[in-house]
Amino acid sequence: MSDLFAKLMDQIEMPLDMRRSSAFSSADIIEVKVHSVSRLWEFHFAFAAVLPIATYRELHDRLIRTFEAADIKVTFDIQAAQVDYSDDLLQAYYQEAFEHAPCNSASFKSSFSKLKVTYEDDKLIIAAPGFVNNDHFRNNHLPNLVKQFEAFGFGTLTIDMVSDQEMTEHLTKNFVSSRQALVEKAVQDNLEAQKSLEAMMPPVEEATPAPKFDYKERAAKRQAGFEKATITPMIEIETEENRIVFEGMVFDVERKTTRTGRHIINFKMTDYTSSFALQKWAKDDEELRKFDMIAKGAWLRVQGNIETNPFTKSLTMNVQQVKEIVHHERKDLMPEGQKRVEFHAHTNMSTMDALPTVESLIDMAAKWGHKAVAITDHANVQSFPHGYHRARKAGIKAIFGLEANIVEDKVPISYDPVDMDLHEATYVVFDVETTGLSAMNNDLIQIAASKMFKGNIVEQFDEFIDPGHPLSAFTTELTGITDKHLQGAKPLVTVLKAFQDFCKDSILVAHNASFDVGFMNANYERHDLPKITQPVIDTLEFARNLYPEYKRHGLGPLTKRFQVSLDHHHMANYDAEATGRLLFIFLKDAREKHGIKNLLQLNTDLVAEDSYKKARIKHATIYVQNQVGLKNMFKLVSLSNIKYFEGIPRIPRTVLDAHREGLLLGTACSDGEVFDAVLTKGIDAAVDLAKYYDFIEIMPPAIYQPLVVRELIKDQAGIEQVIRDLIEVGKRANKPVLATGNVHYLEPEEEIYREIIVRSLGQGAMINRTIGRGEGAQPAPLPKAHFRTTNEMLDEFAFLGKDLAYQVVVENTQDFADRIEEVEVVKGDLYTPYIDKAEETVAELTYQKAFEIYGNPLPDIIDLRIEKELTSILGNGFAVIYLASQMLVNRSNERGYLVGSRGSVGSSFVATMIGITEVNPMPPHYVCPSCQHSEFITDGSVGSGYDLPNKPCPKCGTPYQKDGQDIPFETFLGFDGDKVPDIDLNFSGDDQPSAHLDVRDIFGDEYAFRAGTVGTVAEKTAYGFVKGYERDYGKFYRDAEVERLAAGAAGVKRTTGQHPGGIVVIPNYMDVYDFTPVQYPADDVTASWQTTHFNFHDIDENVLKLDILGHDDPTMIRKLQDLSGIDPITIPADDPGVMALFSGTEVLGVTPEQIGTPTGMLGIPEFGTNFVRGMVNETHPTTFAELLQLSGLSHGTDVWLGNAQDLIKEGIATLKTVIGCRDDIMVYLMHAGLEPKMAFTIMERVRKGLWLKISEEERNGYIDAMRENNVPDWYIESCGKIKYMFPKAHAAAYVLMALRVAYFKVHHPIMYYCAYFSIRAKAFELKTMSGGLDAVKARMEDITIKRKNNEATNVENDLFTTLEIVNEMLERGFKFGKLDLYKSDAIEFQIKGDTLIPPFIALEGLGENVAKQIVKARQEGEFLSKMELRKRGGASSTLVEKMDEMSILGNMPEDNQLSLFDDFF
């Protein structure tokens, strides 16, 4: 028996005779898991054998009883070295199992606890009667029984049930006989009753016929019963039950149709006590129509049976009846004109703290008839844009504000300093102990001080004070002071007077002096004694400024660091003496290190410029009053996030003062300085502070309730008095008092969502700091912070009297709302930056290139297209966007990289001519590179110019060049050409950082910002929060409730970030604060770029956003160019070998069986995925135009599956004729004869998935026009299925890049494989890759099997893709070499003849930095030992061992120390 286990047995007083049993001989505690919040302890014991049942029960009962006394729940399990499977022991433990949850459920226990068990063939067999639903119990209860036996110490048992025929017959016989007896008795009783009834009834002359059974009447009665049935709260349902009625809201719905045509709807409902999964089958059309009422957000009454779902294993209601009910929502019942305005409301942009979207907040205020509502998120304004748009739509005023973190710029070390020599001064170092932190609501219980001169204590003061009431346990626990200490203590006023006399002619000193001085002054004021006027030194601020490198400056940490005795921290006499010792250490260091000799110097010479970083934070609400104020607000938010960020955004008071124009200030919540002053310093001090603000905030008593739990306020009466005091402060300071709600969610029942979000922050968050100490300490409850109606607010403040309550709730809030002007948060126009002569330059570059290709004069079709585009581009101010993109592309080209275009920019011929994109949107055409003669095919017969047959120029005989993808300009800038151009560009990932810096270089650092994003809590993350809350707070939720809670907690702001390639450019004739505040991404103050504070989507129509994305294709092309010397621009788009890849593998010299796929698509961008390879196999593309179709089909939504795929399979259409890319719709319809405007509109409706959402009248108009122009019905039907379509220009750019890569795969294979593995491959397994074909194929087979069983990891899935290419490479006759310590590169694969040599980074677990370090170290000299490789190369022992296992190190010794024998030779 271990010592720890013996100690536990002593504590629970386990009987000695039981402890001496053989099972206890080696007893030990394997582990104890302590869940501090839920106060659950989990013991894991080890015993020599399974305990006798009596011993187990004794151990169980004593553990439970002992720990219950300390309010701790206990569970335990046992690991037994030897297991006894005797029938008696098993039967005893079987009976015991039904005393433990969840085996003690009523249905399981009543059916099974009396059955017999035996142990046969390594199984525990339960003999059950044959009529028991074995499948139900086997699936739902036996797993729990297995777990319980494992906890008893039997290990993992297999438990099964068998039907006992003898028992079945016996029970059946008993059942039949007992039932027969009951029937006979019932018949006899009925006869006797009938006789009695007949005796009482008058004779009947004529018998009436028996009524027929009326099914309608029965249905009506059932419906009446359903209407009147008792509603069961969902939380009360724990087992299977029949005819249960719920009422609740639907929050999840899924409709299904089975293969047999039956309809089922699965849905989830909540009544806010819990949630439930429900399902309903439709028996007929009438039942099916009822499905329509089961919609998300609907309130229903349902009746059905509760059963265990065999698939989910959870209780589910099979719904028999359903009815929609009216949900009585809260309403603001005050008359119009008498409704409040909420001035303190948080949205889900308050980081990890509040729930409502700004739209839902504004909608609720508008629905209630409020004329305005304020937005006051914590330290950010990210909800402003959406709030601005929603308020305009809802017709109410949005008041834009925030709850700021205000700090003092320089927190003084000394208060009221005078000219005094610090070395010659006398100090009174004092400390107070109190019953709480509120000077107004708590009491002084000890004042202690040490009078010191030149480091010596010359006199001491120490007095206890009787507060007149018993001390709370919390106070005693914190201070160590008991009621006994206070017996016989002097009255407070006597102690105060004596202490004032003690302090005369001295400098007062305290640690965190603002608290001690505030408490003393409040008590002096209360007893008509003079407040403190002599100088005060705060040793807390002294330490912070003198030792900024220390992380902690509390009294405890400082005394430890300076080895000052502090025997009883939080008793005033000990604290005061320790503070005095520290003071003289500080004075000595200040004199020696900083030359501080005079009291005045402490603040002037020692207080650091950045002392705001350590300053105490106070909340204030700041509101935008006018347009000037909005810009100042943006500046303040920016400064708080950029210059003054320290853990959280901070606004120094002087900075606020400098930008206060157009802003209004409120005193905020209980964390505001005015509220704090009322609590800790008194009304006079609060009045002085209140003069800084524009209004005083008071909140419902329920909001302040946590302060009672924290013992800052005594009780409800104390809260009401604080509110009255705040009103008095407003009266004295001549400031209006506004009742605000501190809204964090909209409805009362949403409180749990915030609870889950806030508690997920852990105990490190201030809001979760525990009350008291020890493992059982809990955080204070969160306040009831829902959005209150005017009536509810008036009720909250009814204690003030009707008139005063109405004034602070309604009149003052309405008046203050009227002081605030409407502002424009989001501008209505686009503001592009200015580049000198941008319009002239774009036009000049366009015509210059056009003349170069097509000659001068230009062909009419080219001239008209350029004129049309330039009219739109120059007329709408878009030239600067084009020119900026051209400059960026040109710079990247000059660095040796191609830039691929994305999106629809390839629809613009001007973009093609100035070099932004390679895609030529003109109709397919020939053009002579020598004489510029051209031929255009404009009848739609050719899909791409690259598919035109080769032919010479008829004028000069030079082979024609071929181009043109037939893409209308309208798909880029809209039909009227006024849509803001969104130019997305794919730069090489290697060159992307340089391209980003180019933007700064072109426009200036102060005008270029990364596009900001806001990261919110995803539903999966919220699910984890809910499960953590269950664990930490001892909750248990059924699956449906977990889903509901996770959905409710999702969407809350968690962090900020940046778009991977988006750069926002502010016009150089404005500044960023005209559009948005700025910040660092994810609060990373070391980031090289600042981001927009607003999500970039919120301002993307006001400023230029450049999408400078990183992509592998340009990097791959650059690598192939470096390896081959081939200019990728010269690679033909119609190379026969490349096109052959799409129809077979012969061009690669392998069979489909060798590489496992019928085509050569492996590793080709756009076409190498399993999905697209399948499309290629079905469609057999042979032209560039068909490849464009495939690209469009594979990227669209509902374009291929269930649409084009079926049309092709059924022979209705071909790959060429189906709808593939969005632009094809407009082109096809115009060729069919529709007007361009209508063709464009139809394309827009279809590509956005709106075809079935527009009105039937509008849709029929389009259909009639198409049919009039002989557009086939299948084409029209196909339009109706599409949800999203890919731009043809995007497809063309991607396909062109893909064909260039494919060219190298066909004609320069070893270079292709080198580039692929260097750039695209995501996972490596070098041992397999260098092990030959058999090893590669065996590993692929292994992963294939895992995939079928859903067991493959993400790494294995990535590895499979890599191995497919390795296999193909090996089958083509190339080799994969081993990692070479002296030849391998750090990052890139190397070509050695027909062999690839892998780089160091391909070794699993070896990162880029170590790879580069190894290469650098080997250049300095050979590695003589493994130790040297670890030391110089930076490789870990694990990596060196792995290299050794792969025979990379040869015979390298462990170390390079020579033996004594070696020295002689």
Curated annotation (Swiss-Prot):
GO molecular function: 3'-5' exonuclease activity; DNA binding; DNA-directed DNA polymerase activity
Catalysis performed (reactions): DNA(n) + a 2'-deoxyribonucleoside 5'-triphosphate = DNA(n+1) + diphosphate
Keywords: Cytoplasm, DNA replication, DNA-directed DNA polymerase, Exonuclease, Hydrolase, Nuclease, Nucleotidyltransferase, Transferase
SMART domains referenced in this protein's UniProt entry, alphabetically: EXOIII (SM00479), POLIIIAc (SM00481)
GO biological process, one term: DNA-templated DNA replication
Pfam families recorded: DNA_pol3_a_NI (PF14480), DNA_pol3_a_NII (PF11490), DNA_pol3_alpha (PF07733), DNA_pol3_finger (PF17657), HHH_6 (PF14579), PHP (PF02811), RNase_T (PF00929)
Biological role stated in the UniProt entry: Required for replicative DNA synthesis. This DNA polymerase also exhibits 3' to 5' exonuclease activity.
Protein name in UniProt: DNA polymerase III PolC-type
